[in-house]
């Protein structure tokens, strides 16, 4: 028998205070919203209210325990195809900032990609009214404008308890007054397709470094779904970037750059076999070339070196996960968003673990024992989250400077065959 869990009459202390302050008049606007249902495949059914796009959707239900940063999370390409549940009870209270405003590097100032990447969101209580000096619209308006399904009034504590016990599950959000268990909308598994292909640039593009930051460095970026703040962290340290599609044969031109960076991204890393093959060739041909990978980039680098990746039960998605630096013994608080991890037991003898998750003891990084190559499962750039490990970008740049000094070459300018001057200046979708 399927149990339908009804939304609470008053979903939060905030609404209860409002209820008392108005003399017992319930002033929340959820009564004006359409009813909606969140259905977990082979699991519970939650009834709530729709405040997003008026459409039915299906995807993988995951959760984040991050307290803030919902605009950044929702535009993170790593969430492509997923239904994101926020454990923070009240979401939307500071609204949504501009999704088009750019900074001095021509990168989005507030968002991590040009569009919302998750297919739907689940919250306990949505703030339909907002207050913040950077906000230009409400979360409701943004979801509706972006075509994102959104449901509020859900018992997110019970939902997260289920996902922690059973693991990340397929789910769907349907709009309508009555739940129909025989509804023909199928449960679609986003993990069955190559999600990286959907979020990666379709052609190379170039990001110039402003003169006041420039150090004459040029880094090649493999775009598996790169967050804007990752690109910003590279440019603000003095490098121009040429960003390539995830499956670009980087081994053929890697020696034209000062370093290679492999970005974050969504889904199963084994779907990117061409990327791992190209990385393996690159490491075989250029022994001293600095390489740095983050999140999916970490997993792809591990696969390229002969290690194995595994799907986690429910993944790690939060801004407060402790990671132990096995080199220094220091513990850092990190921002994470991933459903797969590297099996440290399968690392080749030339590699060693770099960081370990102190919550579940999963691998959080690796490094080569004799070459300037390392990677992390967590996000040193955060956005949102702590910046405890931002020093890893500095480490990457130190490796680059040493590489240039050792080779005695000025590698900062790529040859004319790449036609950097005429490359697009933004991601080609």
Swiss-Prot record:
It is an enzyme of class 6 (ligase). It holds the Pfam family GATase. One of its GO terms (molecular function) is ATP binding. The active site is at 295 (nucleophile), 379, 381. The keyword Nuclease does not apply. HAMAP family: CPSase_S_chain. NCBIfam families: CPSaseIIsmall, PRK12838.1. Heterodimer composed of 2 chains; the small (or glutamine) chain promotes the hydrolysis of glutamine to ammonia, which is used by the large (or ammonia) chain to synthesize carbamoyl phosphate. This is Carbamoyl phosphate synthase arginine-specific small chain.
